[in-house]
Curated annotation (Swiss-Prot):
NCBIfam families: dxs (TIGR00204), PRK05444.2-2 (NF003933). Catalyzes the acyloin condensation reaction between C atoms 2 and 3 of pyruvate and glyceraldehyde 3-phosphate to yield 1-deoxy-D-xylulose-5-phosphate (DXP). Binds 1 Mg(2+) ion per subunit. The keyword Zinc-finger does not apply. Its EC number is 2.2.1.7. Homodimer. This is 1-deoxy-D-xylulose-5-phosphate synthase. Transmembrane segments: none annotated. Keywords: Isoprene biosynthesis, Magnesium, Metal-binding, Thiamine biosynthesis, Thiamine pyrophosphate, Transferase. Pathway: Metabolic intermediate biosynthesis; 1-deoxy-D-xylulose 5-phosphate biosynthesis; 1-deoxy-D-xylulose 5-phosphate from D-glyceraldehyde 3-phosphate and pyruvate: step 1/1. GO terms for cellular component: cytosol. It is an enzyme of class 2 (transferase).
């Protein structure tokens, strides 16, 4: 059977092991071809092909429910649920999402983007099933490091106290998240999986017996039984721990052996109460380069499938903001042993792997544990250290109480460096970083800044590291800088709460924040062509806002525009409007940013165009709002 003929996962039921293996081969081929062309998450999906096929071969997906953790594991799931023919549109505008979306397929039973959510959602479904007198199966597939997250452990703790609630948890144990897993739980699983001396003895016992007189090869069947018994002894320790938590335990089993997977899943489905199936997989399975470099091939930009090398850009690009951040912070840390970089399992993405390589004693990876990362930073700050929490904007949401309760209320000097702030592109709504201004600005003691370019990023890093009057946050975007020269030394901190005038004009005041400052300058040049001269201000800080600069300019010029790459509700424009209201500055104000809606997956440029945030669109709207009697429309 060709996988393109599979439009429903129940079609797997009648297939032989050989046919299922052929389906697995086709899934891997499509997966590799698509990611090589479009970019996206490569390693996670390759590791769960057989797991997905075997699980769905034992379920009735017209009734049964499956929740997937960190949805980039679910690419094989998407192909088996009627999306194979459109899989080439993965992460493209109007195409298939890179994560699970309930609105995309009836088989996406729960949306997933962030880690450690699957067991909680599945348990909720199981309890709803029982309350309504139904009897379908509910399965949570968790892995790629997500079991290190506290939320997953909270769900296991709850489920283990419900002995009559049928729930299956499948642990996809590939020893990895994005980077190698850290922490005691991961280390314990790895001991069971790889290094137990009893397991080693079982694996080598038969070879030793072959060298003894009278035995030779004659004991093979008996030896297999001995080996299996010893292996069961080897894994009984982790099984005992899981069963102490209230779960029946199966495993670990070979995550790439369809026969073993199907047999184990069928047994596990018969269990009353919660059950955990421990599946050992290889991240990147089937693509040798990804198996050897599981961190590098977790996610890829478009690449050459034969060589594994990224397809070069048609023209050289400036360094990414993450790369500039990593270089600058590492340089500062070399001269300041109190600087400690903290990441929550995102060392490569944030650039902190560079700090780890050069100054490992000044680097901490807490695993998928954002709440712990923030309070840990608070403890470090209490004792005079300079903690720098490098985290994606979307993931800091997960530690909001810790930011407020543990850091801001105590006014501790923790430096939050929020990567991927603003519009992130192909990862879509679950990963957009457009809410941080709003959710941080309302917290007392918090200072918030954003650089207009990569050189100003360097100065803001110096500012944050040297700021000791309380917590401070810096937001910066995904992707490359705009190409301004970088400084290798002589960095000076910025004055807190002070912006700068970049361009003078008497007809309009444009206040830009962060990445939108460059857009403001471009829009101002377009307006000049229509006889309109604008003053452009780089605000730098949204809190404290530079009212000493902004308010007199607003009163003198009389027309004000704000630009931000973030949500309008509670954002930079709202801060300006509040300042105008508080100081009785009665001037017309037009705010540009992200309205009260979700932003789907697309390229950042496509999303900005959809939101009316390109410089031509902004200039057009300014003309319509403030100068409609002066010039005809420029944009069709």
């Amino acid at each position: 059977m060709h996988i393109s003929d599979i439009t429903h996962p129940n079609q797997l039921h009648g297939l032989s092991i050989r046919q299922l293996e052929d389906v697995a081969r086709q899934i891997r081929e499509k997966h590799l071809q698509t990611i090589a062309a479009t970019g996206g998450h490569l390693g996670p999906g390759l590791g769960v092909v057989e797991l997905t096929i075997a699980l769905y071969q034992t379920l009735d997906l017209d009734r049964d429910k499956v929740t997937w953790d960190v949805g980039h594991q679910a690419y094989p799931h998407k192909m088996l649920t009627g999306r194979y023919k459109n899989f080439h549109t993965l992460r493209q505008k109007d195409g298939i999402a890179g994560y699970l979306k309930r609105c995309e397929s009836k088989f996406d039973h729960f949306g997933a983007g962030h880690a450690s959510t699957s067991i909680s959602a599945a348990l909720g479904m199981a309890l709803a099933r029982d309350a309504q007198g139904e009897d379908y199966k509910v399965v949570a597939v968790i892995g790629d490091g997500a079991l290190t997250g506290g939320m997953a452990l909270e769900a296991i703790n709850h489920a283990g106290h419900l002995p009559h609630t049928n729930l299956m948890v499948v642990l996809n144990d590939n020893e990895m998240s994005i980077s190698p897993n850290v922490g005691a739980i991961s280390r314990y699983l790895n001991k069971v999986r790889l290094s137990d001396p009893v397991q080693f003895l079982a694996d080598n016992l038969e070879e030793q017996f072959k060298h003894l007189p009278f035995f030779g090869d004659s004991l093979s069947p008996e030896m297999e039984r001995v080996k299996e018994g010893m292996k069961r002894l080897a894994v009984s320790k982790v099984g005992a721990v899981i069963e102490e938590l209230g779960f029946k335990y199966f495993g670990p089993i070979d995550g790439h052996n369809l026969q073993e997977l199907i047999s184990t899943f069928k047994q596990a489905h018969k269990v009353t109460g919660p059950v955990l199936v421990h599946v050992a997989t290889v991240k990147g399975k089937g693509y040798e380069l990804a198996e050897k470099d599981q961190v590098g091939y977790h996610a890829q930009s478009p690449f050459n499938l034969a060589t594994g090398k990224a397809i070069p850009s048609s023209k050289p690009k400036p360094p990414s903001y993450a790369k500039v951040f990593a270089h600058t912070l590492t340089t500062l840390a070399e001269n300041n042993p109190k600087i400690i970089g903290i990441t929550a399992a995102m060392a490569t993405g944030t650039g902190l792997d560079k700090l780890q390589a050069k100054l490992p004693k000044q680097y901490i990876d807490v695993g998928i544990a954002e709440q712990h990362a923030v309070t840990l930073a608070g403890g470090l700050a209490c004792e005079g250290m300079r903690p720098v929490v490098a985290i994606y904007s979307t993931f800091l949401q997960r530690a909001y109480d810790q930011v407020l309760h543990d850091v801001c209320i105590q006014n501790l000097p923790v430096f939050f460096c929020m990567d991927r702030a603003g519009i992130v592109g192909a990862d879509g709504p679950t990963h957009q970083g457009m809410y941080d201004i709003a959710y941080l600005r309302c917290i007392p003691n918090m200072t918030i800044m954003a650089p207009k370019d990569e050189a100003e990023l360097q100065r803001m890093i110096v500012t944050g590291v040297n700021y000791t009057d309380g917590p401070i946050a810096m937001r910066y975007p995904r992707g490359n800088g705009i190409g301004v020269p970088l400084m290798e030394e002589g960095w000076e901190p910025l004055p807190i709460g002070k912006g700068e005038i970049l361009r003078n004009g008497d007809d309009l005041l444009i206040l830009g924040y962060g990445t939108m400052v460059n857009t403001a300058l471009q829009a101002a040049e377009t307006l000049r062509e229509h006889g309109i001269e604008a003053t452009v201000v780089n605000a730098r800080f949204v809190k404290p806002l530079d009212t000493e600069l902004i308010l007199p300019l607003a009163q003198r010029i009389g027309k004000v525009v704000t630009l931000e790459e973030g949500c309008l509700m509670g954002g930079f424009g709202s801060a300006v409007a509040e300042a105008f209201s508080d100081h009785n500055v009665l001037v017309p104000l037009k705010r540009f940013g992200v309205p009260d809606r979700l932003v789907d997956h697309a390229t950042p440029d496509q999303s900005k165009a959809d939101l009316g945030l390109t410089s031509p669109q902004i200039a057009e709207q300014i003309l319509q709002v403030f100068f409609s009697n002066r010039q005809p429309s420029m944009v069709s």
